[in-house]
Each structure stands twice: as C-alpha cells, then as structure tokens.
Amino acid sequence: MKKKDNAERILGNLAQALNNLQGCREFSLLMPEVRVNVVHALPGARSGMEVAAVDGRITVVRGYPCAAGSPAWGASDHMARLIIEARKYSQGVNAGINFKCDNEIIKIVKKYARDNKLVFGWIDRTREPEDVAARDGSSMPWKIRQLVEQSKRLPDIFYEGDGWGKEPLFVILGVDAVSVVRMATEIARIYKKQKTKSA
C-alpha cells in the first residue's frame, strides 16, 4: 500500500475512533489533568510528523469527551514518541490512548486485562535514574525498556506511577485507533457502573 493511501486510511481510522470516544459520556470520568490524546502511526514511523493525533488533545465539554481540533500529522509529542519507541519492541503496535490513573482505576484495568487476556504492566517512575530524567528524550526509551523487562514483552495496557511533577497515567496500545478507543470506552463504562453501585 502506498504511503499516501496508508496516511488516508489512518486519518479515517482516527476520525472514527474520535467519533466513538466523543459518544461515550462515561469516558469523561477518566479524563486526566493533562487531557487525552489518541495517536496512530504510519508503518515504520520515525518522527512525530509520521504520527497522527488529535490537534489540541481531547477534553470534557458538557459532560462528554470533546476534541479541541481535528486529527492531524505531528499533533502529538509525548504519545507520538511513546508509540515510536514501543514499535521497536512490537511492530504490531500502531496506536495508543492515555487516560487517568488512580488506585480504583488500577483495580478495574487489572481485571479487564485479565478477563481479556491482555498483558498488564506498570512503570515505577521513582526508580528512574536522575541522569535519565534530566536528559531530554531519555525518559521514553528507559520507560519502554522497563515495561518490556518486567513483562517479558510489551504490555497491551500499562500505567506510569507518580513521578516528580508527573501525573499518573494509563496507556493502552494496539493495532489501530479504533481498537484502543474501544478498550478505553469499555473500561470507562465498567468504572462508571462501579461508581454508581458504590454511590
């Protein structure tokens, strides 16, 4: 498939994923302070310009997830670098989404991963070496390496714990944007159901 055809297919997949996410009111409960992005990389992507994402990220408007902009190439930094690094360990990973992490959500996601035969992982940011944290661009390779060493492969779902000035976050990795959003919205609906029961 030509690169142009791939690019159009990816933008279409991302637009569909975004539409699905914006229709899931429950996902607003998983919105982190840093907001959410969904990314989808071209095969063999080596730079952020080869990764499509939601321009301006996704926030909450009137109780629903809402994109600040449209899917665009080069619209993400952090999540784009994460996907590019993750692909060094698994070529099947093309897309990702981030969302809020706390102890209650961790329990739900662990069970969801177990029930769906997904590999669950976590990163202990307190173990990150000072020289790695201080050097631009060094954290991402270290984080992905930690995940692979701990899980013996790249996890499907993982969280980053607290770090200095860092918000804990979950990340789902998958073959395309639609599939990672499907998992995220399923988790959001389970989370909402549990919160309603305990209210």
Q: Can you name each region flagged by the protein language model?
A:
Residues M1-A199:
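Conserved mixed alpha/beta catalytic, RNA-binding, or beta-rich assembly cores of soluble enzyme
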